[in-house]
């Protein structure tokens, strides 16, 4: 999808949005992975293990 062009009705029908509920989960944002393959975006955000947490 190119944001520089006008969206067609076809593009609008194909757009999807998803929200994922995230409760008290710590994630490693610097280790996330985004892969676009055949028009499908796959997102992997690993959880931080309890012993790896650096917060106070």
Swiss-Prot record:
One of its GO terms (cellular component) is mitochondrion. The keyword Disulfide bond does not apply. The keyword Mitochondrion applies. Keywords: Mitochondrion, Stress response. Disulfide bonds: none annotated. Induction: By heat shock, and under other conditions of stress, such as increased salt concentration and starvation. It comes from the Eukaryota. It is found in: Mitochondrion. May play a protective role against oxidative stress. Belongs to the small heat shock protein (HSP20) family. This is Heat shock 22 kDa protein, mitochondrial. It comes from Solanum lycopersicum (Tomato).
């Amino acid at each position: 999808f190119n944001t520089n062009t006008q969206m067609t009705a076809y593009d609008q029908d194909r757009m999807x949005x998803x929200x994922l509920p995230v409760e008290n989960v710590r994630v490693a944002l610097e280790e996330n992975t985004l892969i676009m393959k055949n028009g499908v975006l796959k997102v992997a955000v690993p959880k931080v293990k309890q012993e790896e947490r650096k917060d106070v």
